[in-house]
Regions:
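Hydrophobic core of alpha-helical transmembrane segments in multi-pass integral membrane proteins
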Residues: 1-2, 47-53
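N-terminal transmembrane-helix/juxtamembrane module of multi-pass inner/ER membrane proteins
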Residues: 1-42, 82-92
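Short helix-capping/hinge motifs at transmembrane helix termini and TM-loop junctions
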Residues: 3-5, 57-58, 84-85, 150-151, ...
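Membrane-interface loops
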Residues: 10, 46-47, 56-126
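Alpha-helical transmembrane segments of multi-pass membrane proteins, especially transporters
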Residues: 17, 65-70, 158-162
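Membrane-interface helix-boundary signature
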Residues: 28-31, 63, 126-133
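Hydrophobic alpha-helical transmembrane segments of polytopic
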Residues: 43-46, 50, 70, 132, ...
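Membrane-embedded catalytic cores of phosphoryl/pyrophosphoryl-handling enzymes
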Residues: 90-179
């Protein structure tokens, strides 16, 4: 589309080489488990369960907010991938066939864990909020690292996914506070 043939940057290729250098079976197995745990199907299933829980608890505002933001996230990811049409690294440890920029795993998992953190901690103490947000950040970073380690993405794909997630979250919280 507009940004077709968006080539990897020097930092992308050097990071890719570094991931080859640290490759080992245990880290590969762990990374594949994380990849499957935070793929589209897994996040959709978990999101439906969480939305059903909110519905069951008569928290329809949370249900609608959470479900709609996950749908918006999916749409943003699809739009950006089609806009940039960036090819993934050739030496993948886990084959992916669609475009790579931004990382859908990094974007969706970051929105997912931080939305849950936001909804869970709204009525909690500052200490609890800090712990929950730190945990969400660690999960997001692990997902991002595994995408780079598996060479399913360039470093900048993952960083762009984090930026997209941050923008989605800021927009989501802005809208949620007004309604």
């Amino acid at each position: 589309m507009i940004f077709q043939n968006f080539a990897p940057l020097a930092i992308d290729t050097s990071t890719n080489v570094a991931m080859v250098a640290i490759e080992n079976p245990l880290l590969t197995a762990f990374s594949k488990v994380i990849a499957v745990s935070f793929d589209t199907i897994s996040l959709v299933v978990i999101s439906v369960i969480i939305s059903a829980y909110f519905f069951y608890r008569n928290q329809s505002k949370k249900e609608l907010f959470f479900a709609s933001m996950m749908v918006v996230t999916g749409a943003v990811i699809y739009f950006l991938k089609e806009l940039f049409q960036r090819v993934r690294p050739m030496n993948q440890l886990m084959a992916e066939t669609n475009f790579g920029f931004p990382s859908g795993h990094a974007t969706a998992s970051t929105v997912f864990v931080f939305l849950l953190a936001y909804l869970y901690t709204k009525d909690k103490s500052n200490e609890t909020r800090k712990k929950v947000y730190w945990a969400a950040g660690v999960v997001a970073l692990i997902v991002g690292f595994t995408r780079i380690y598996l060479r399913a993405h360039w470093l900048t794909d993952v960083l762009a996914g984090f930026v997209a997630a941050a923008l989605i979250l800021v927009g989501a919280i802005f809208v949620e506070k007004r309604f």
